[in-house]
Amino acid sequence: MTAWQPRALLALCAIGLCSGASANLTFSGTLNEPPPCTIDAGNTIEIDFGDVGVKRVDGVRYRRGVGYVINCGADTLPWALKLSVNGTPTAFDGSAVQTSVPALGIRVFQNSLPFALNTPMDITLSSPPTLEVVPVQQPGATLPPARFTAVATLLAEYQ
């Protein structure tokens, strides 16, 4: 391109011989907050394993169901609901909550499969997963006679 060509093009555009189109853009929307949810009306869910034999902890015996009810507001669409069990996992099982006894954990199951702690999963409010828990011990460990406790949080949230 010679030196005069860019100047000529600029002059043509300046006097209106070059044309273009423009349009205005308008953006709008509504910010919505997801409906509030509660699990068991905010009450603590307690699972008592009773007396557990130190030599009988095998990940099968003492299995218990976790009864819970999720209640959310009436307008749940189009929100995607997620459920998680949050707590400190044992060093030997990512699906087991650490108890007050170092070599003992409480494994969590969802629909009979191990439920990885601190990992949200998609659920449907009309058919939430069945949750179960069972005591498990670290392989090769010997459990001492002792009372044990463990704490986790069952969390339902919209994404």
Regions flagged by a language model, labelled:
Residues 9-17:
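Bacterial N-terminal signal peptides
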